[in-house]
Each structure stands twice: as structure tokens, then as C-alpha cells.
Regions:
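Betabetaalpha-Me/HNH-type nuclease active-site subdomain
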Residues: 61
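Glycine-rich beta-strand-to-loop/alpha-helix junction loops that act as flexible
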Residues: 54-58
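Glycine-rich active-site/cofactor-binding loop and its immediate structural neighborhood
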Residues: 76-77
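Structured mid-to-C-terminal alpha-helical surface segments
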Residues: 1-52, 64, 68, 80-338
């Protein structure tokens, strides 16, 4: 099968240009999407493939075609059952995180490299993220039980220009703490393959993907938890508002607010596996949930939304004011659910 990278430079540039015209998204993003796709393909050939799950915002665009947003990161999980740890005590959760982190950084990282080479991919290097940089620029080792683990695939862009908001690297976040269900197998392909069928078939893969009903609820819960912090984040966070708005009128969004069992299972799972001191998990329940940014946060969130609209969305967008109106409407729907 053919891989985009195997074409001549002139052919690859022509394909990027045509895909840019079709999807109305910058060539830098088209190129990065190809790397996201081929990295996904290689990851789902690793030894944990049977327990590997594709989730998050990128799964909404690449797996389900539900959002018109370029998604640059790969969010994955491996079932805790894969590591043979079933109990949920604090000590067992710490043991699980340590065992999983060693496996991700030692085994998955090496297998990813091997699988990319088998596909014929060149011009990249893999970095296991083992240090954190604080606000003062000081580096410190990442904790041995840190979850998720982060692996970066740095690639050599064939384009002469770059965009600060879209660096030439694929960020892989892989966790051992996520739920296993509900999921469904989905076909993943690059923008190049969708523009020129058959010309990038080797990068295409079928991957186990989280069903959007769950992703929809998890995004609302993530925001509700974030806004319980004294100083909530805003950089690259407005995408969750965009995704919620895009999903709220779909069958998945409507079903999510009718499935009390799924709703409560996700809340319970988060309270056990993601427990953090600043979150009151009872506030995730419909009667109390709040995922609308506070007034003092609006300027920062509006700025982040503008950045996202400029670089990542390839369809018409709502104004920030209209987006907030829709999110408030959605919050009302949550409050009236069940």
C-alpha cells in the first residue's frame, strides 16, 4: 500500500495544497494530521493494542467526523486490566500508575519507533517526557507514578514555514486510569487520503475508539472540575467549549443526558481514579454542575478561542458571545436531566 511520505517532494507538496483547498485548513495542519494518523496506526500495532483505546477531542474529529476542528494531540488509554491490577485502593492505584508508566516509556515508546520504521516512516525522533518545567523555567523530574505519560514524536516538516500554535511534533498522552467502555471500532485516515483515495492507504487504520456520548460527558465534567480550581487554566481549553457546542444537538449529546447509568458510572470512576483534593465530585451531578467560565476568566478564554478559530477550525465559527449562550443553554439541559 502507498504512503504519502513515499511520494516525491513535488507530489507531496501538491497533495498538501489540494487538501488545504478541500478542507480550508493550513498546510502546516494538513502535514501534522498526516503524522497524527501514521502515529496512531503504529501505536495500534503495539503489544497493548487489544487493550488500547483512542479517546478525547481528536477521536471526535478523526474517528467520528463530528467536529470541524483540527486536533493535534493523541489521547489514549490502556485498560488497568492489562497490568493485572484490579483493586482500587490508594496503594493499588499508585502501583498501577508506576507499572503503567514504566511500560509506556520503556516498551510502547520503543515499539512505536519500530512500527513506524516498518511502515517506512523517516524524518522523526521520539522523546519520552521525563521532566516538567515550572513557571520559572526550572526543570524537575516527572514523578514515577505520573499519569498520563507523555511521549512526543518530533518530525521534520517539509514546509519552509511553521506556526507557533502548531509545533512539528505529535503529543501522545497515554493513561492507565480511564474507563474501558463504551467504545467502537472506527476507521482513521489522513486528510491526504481523504483528498486522494488510495494515495496514503498505508497510514489508514481501524482503531478502538470511545463513543461520543462518553466524550461529551467527560468534557463537561473536566470543565466543571477545572473551574473548581482557585486559578483555572485557559490555554487550549476553549476547545472543550467548542466540542460541547458541536455535540449538544447530535444524537450522542441528547443520549448522554438520557443515560443516567453512564452518567453516574463516569462520575464514580473519576472520583476513584482521578481523585484530587480541590474537586467536590458531587458538583458533577446534574443539579449542581457548572461548566460556564466565570466572568473574571472571560478575557483569557475569549483570547484562547480566537487562537483556536484562527488555526484549528476549518468551518464557520460562532462568536465567543454566541458560544457562551449555547454553553449556558447546554448547562440548563444538564440541570433538567433525569
Amino acid at each position: 500500500m502507498t504512503l504519502w511520505l513515499n511520494h516525491t517532494i513535488d507530489e507531496r507538496i501538491a497533495m498538501l495544497q489540494r487538501a488545504e483547498e478541500k478542507f480550508r485548513i493550513n498546510q502546516v495542519a494538513i502535514e501534522k494530521d498526516w503524522w497524527v494518523t501514521v502515529v496512531l496506526n503504529a501505536l495500534f500495532k503495539c503489544s497493548c493494542a487489544d487493550q488500547l483505546i483512542f479517546k478525547g477531542g481528536t477521536s471526535l474529529s478523526k474517528g467520528w467526523n463530528l467536529i470541524e476542528r483540527f486536533s493535534e494531540d493523541i489521547d489514549l488509554s490502556v485498560s488497568h486490566e492489562f497490568f493485572g491490577i484490579e483493586k482500587t485502593t490508594k496503594n493499588q492505584r499508585e502501583k498501577l500508575r508506576k507499572k503503567a508508566r514504566r511500560y509506556f516509556l520503556d516498551t510502547v515508546s520503543a515499539e512505536l519507533d519500530e512500527n513506524l520504521k516498518k511502515l517506512g516512516v523517516e524524518g522523526y525522533h521520539i522523546e519520552n517526557v521525563v521532566e516538567e518545567i515550572d513557571e520559572d523555567g526550572k526543570a524537575s523530574p516527572v514523578a514515577s507514578d505520573k499519569d498520563p505519560s507523555v511521549i512526543l514524536v518530533h518530525y521534520e516538516s517539509m514546509l519552509g514555514h511553521t506556526i507557533e500554535y502548531i509545533p512539528p511534533r505529535v503529543k501522545i498522552e497515554i493513561s492507565c486510569l480511564s474507563m474501558n467502555e463504551p467504545t467502537e471500532d472506527r476507521l482513521i485516515s489522513s486528510y491526504i487520503e481523504q483528498t486522494f483515495p488510495g494515495e496514503d492507504a498505508a497510514a489508514t487504520a481501524t482503531v478502538r475508539t470511545v463513543v461520543p456520548t462518553r466524550t461529551f460527558l467527560e468534557k463537561a465534567f473536566l470543565l466543571c472540575e477545572e473551574f473548581q480550581k482557585q486559578t483555572p487554566r485557559h490555554v487550549r481549553m476553549s476547545r472543550h467549549l467548542y466540542d460541547l457546542e458541536r455535540l449538544m444537538d447530535t444524537g450522542f449529546g441528547k443520549q448522554a443526558l438520557q443515560d443516567i447509568d453512564l452518567y453516574e458510572r463516569i462520575v464514580k470512576h473519576r472520583s476513584i481514579y482521578y481523585a484530587v483534593g480541590y474537586v467536590d465530585y458531587s458538583k458533577l451531578m446534574p443539579s449542581e454542575i457548572d461548566f460556564v467560565p466565570r466572568q473574571e476568566l472571560m478575557k483569557d478564554w475569549e483570547g484562547d478561542y480566537a487562537e483556536m478559530c484562527n488555526h484549528f477550525i476549518y468551518d464557520q465559527t460562532l462568536s465567543f458571545e454566541k458560544l457562551l449562550e449555547r454553553i449556558k443553554e447546554l448547562q440548563d439541559r444538564f440541570r433538567k436531566a433525569f
